[in-house]
Amino acid sequence: VDKVGTREYWSDWSKDIATIAGRHITMIRHLLDEASPESELRTVFAQFVEGLQQTLNPSIDEEQAIEMLAQHLITKPVFDAMFAGHRFTELNPISLAMQNVVDHLNANAAFEKERESLSAFYESVQRRVKDLDNAAAKQHVIKDLYDKFFQNAFPRIAERLGIVFTPVPVVDYILRSADVALRESFGKSLSDEGVSIIEPFVGTGTFITRLLQLGLIRPEDLERKYTRELFANEIVLLSYYIAAINIETVYGEVAKEHGLGSEYVPFNGMVLTDTFQLSESSHHLNLPAFR
């Protein structure tokens, strides 16, 4: 029996998911084609696409938006199990926008039936992840899952965006080296007040979660650093979604270890955006789908 944390298990899972992803994409496309231009489904989907074009890149088209929705539908049950009780999905505007479109899709009986046919598959995956009881184990699984998931289920996205994840030992080396360089060149540490840190391509959040876990941030500086001096950008919608949950979960665990409280603290430094497009628009966006 394959263990949940093994590459073999997630490789097999992502091969199945490639077929399932194709079915979801076909179904979503069919429902949108069948919907009248004035329908609620078409309206909320158009708002969703507009929001992506404004926040990410004007070149985002309906097909890419459909792929993003398929990613959300396929992996959400897995991460719901892995981060049970997490409040991110209740509060994050991007998550709410995605779920709003999904809710309108679920109103269609054929779509709901297609989803029900996968319930046994999702239950088996959820059973495998529910016993992951610490952030390190979850990060390991997330990295392997995403590596295999995008390569097999969404190869065009992986090729287009160059999705490759840095091994954790390399991440740790880079973070420690940055701290040493900062001390030697500027007399500051990553923990010091006024030292802001941005991860322009956050992926699933490994750099920031390891920063919080390695002890490079002093306990007395944790809350300030997390709430005011840490920032992360991500262009892949589902990576953004998972990175935020991952970072918030790790911060909660580290804060609790240091006696800083156990209440949920959202990571407000997380932004869904194209880092290379940041200088192209500075005006405030009023997007109905992402409120």
Regions found by a protein language model. Name each.
Residues 1-169, 251, 255-265:
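Non-catalytic, mostly N-terminal accessory regions of nucleic-acid modification and defense proteins
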Residues 137, 149-291:
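SAM-dependent methyltransferase catalytic region
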